[in-house]
């Protein structure tokens, strides 16, 4: 597939997602990094987003809860180029009923080449990166070319 460039803006659109057993870990991470996160636009799946809003007072665009379609909503936003970073603390030790949605979300984040953190260490690396508040070019699939080829 041909690639093109997309610029992640200085004010990032960040999706925050956490499975039930990981919600407190994400809450602690968000509270620790609140001064940095407040400069960006936040999205989250339903329960996680409401917990973050309640604990921090930050504005969060809350989707549906993950099992009710929230993971798919976040994935759609990634596909549309509306999410720049995904922080997704998932539980590798417990299966969830919406495991296919989880896999699809991670697949879309990989396809569209956005930074993804699935644990605290990686999330810290991303948010502490000297490029976190910079505009950054990333390579993404050139969908226009892809579609043109398919329609020949």
Curated annotation (Swiss-Prot):
Highest taxon listed in the record's lineage: Bacteria
Q: Which family does it belong to?
A: Belongs to the methylglyoxal synthase family.
Report the PROSITE patterns cross-referenced here: METHYLGLYOXAL_SYNTH, MGS
Q: Which InterPro entries match?
A: Methylgl_synth, Methylglyoxal_synth_AS, MGS-like_dom, MGS-like_dom_sf
Quote the Pfam families the UniProt record gives: MGS
Q: Which molecular function term from Gene Ontology is one that the record holds?
A: methylglyoxal synthase activity
SUPFAM superfamilies linked to this entry: Methylglyoxal synthase-like
Put simply, this protein is called: Methylglyoxal synthase
Has UniProt tagged this entry with the keyword Lyase?
yes
Q: Which GO terms describe its biological process?
A: methylglyoxal biosynthetic process
Which UniProt key words apply to this protein?
Answer: Lyase
**Its function?**
Catalyzes the formation of methylglyoxal from dihydroxyacetone phosphate.
> What EC number(s) has UniProt assigned to this enzyme?
4.2.3.3
Q: Which organism is it from?
A: Salmonella arizonae (strain ATCC BAA-731 / CDC346-86 / RSK2980)
Instruction: Give residue ranges for domain MGS-like.
Output: 6-152
Q: Which reaction does it catalyse?
A: dihydroxyacetone phosphate = methylglyoxal + phosphate
GO CC terms in record: cytosol
Q: Where is the active site?
A: 71 (proton donor/acceptor)
Q: Where does substrate bind?
A: 19, 23, 45-48, 65-66, 98
